[in-house]
């Protein structure tokens, strides 16, 4: 047996280990309206209909006069979902995207996110009093044993081999949801120095 064959065999054994299985820690849903008032409260109703939980309002960190945003003004609403409900909502969101994501959607720490243009695609009935809102989905993945680094008493560190990385997340997405990874978007070159 060569070294390469031994390493592949070890990887296969590691893959079958229950402690190495990836799971959804949480799903964060975010709707950024960019202003406080009636539109924001309607966005909160949309999230409440979708999750069955009370959403939380996010405040602006600093004043941006061009956008008409003041510091500490409520401009967005978000909600964190865990457990089977998170998997159910994620399934709806991925169905809207047709299980297709770009490689850029995945972070180096093993999380991924995407956006949905219209919330009515998720199965919520259209209400003319609320309107149509888009939202962001952020999925945080981890393995069993992460609590070691989070606990209050005697916290430890997670070794590099147990951390979740980009490639593992992409593989998990392809296996669990039969997902498709699209080729990267073409980069548009802007010509700043035009000749007249």
Curated annotation (Swiss-Prot):
Where found in the cell? Answer: Nucleus; Cytoplasm
Q: Name one GO biological process term.
A: translation
Q: Which domain of life is it from?
A: Eukaryota
Membrane-spanning ranges:
none
A GO molecular function annotation here is: rRNA binding
Phenotypic consequence of gene deletion: Mutants have an extended lifespan, increased volume and are sterile with a germ cell proliferation defect.
- Entry's NCBIfam families? PRK04219.1
What other facts are recorded? Answer: There's a functional difference between the two L11-encoding proteins in C.elegans. rpl-11.1 plays a role in the germline whereas rpl-11.2 has a somatic function.
The protein's name in its UniProt record? Large ribosomal subunit protein uL5A
Q: Which gene encodes it?
A: rpl-11.1
């Amino acid at each position: 047996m060569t070294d390469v064959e031994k390493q592949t065999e070890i990887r296969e054994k590691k893959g079958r280990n229950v402690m190495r299985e990836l799971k959804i820690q949480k799903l964060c849903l975010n709707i950024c309206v960019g202003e406080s008032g009636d539109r924001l409260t309607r966005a909160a109703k949309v999230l409440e209909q979708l999750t069955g939980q009370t959403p939380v309002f996010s405040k602006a960190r600093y004043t941006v006069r061009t956008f008409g945003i003041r510091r500490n003004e409520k401009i967005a609403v978000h909600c964190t979902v865990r457990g089977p409900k998170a998997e159910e909502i994620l399934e709806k969101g991925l169905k809207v995207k047709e299980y297709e994501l770009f490689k850029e959607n995945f972070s180096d720490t093993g999380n991924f996110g995407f956006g949905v243009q219209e919330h009515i695609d998720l199965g919520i009935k259209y209400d003319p009093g609320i309107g149509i809102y888009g939202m962001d989905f952020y999925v945080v993945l981890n393995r069993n044993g992460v609590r070691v680094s989070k606990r209050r008493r005697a916290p430890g560190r997670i070794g590099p081999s147990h951390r979740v990385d980009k490639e593992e997340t992409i593989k998990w997405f392809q296996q669990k949801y039969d997902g498709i990874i699209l080729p990267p978007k073409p980069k548009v070159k802007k010509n700043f120095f035009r000749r007249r």
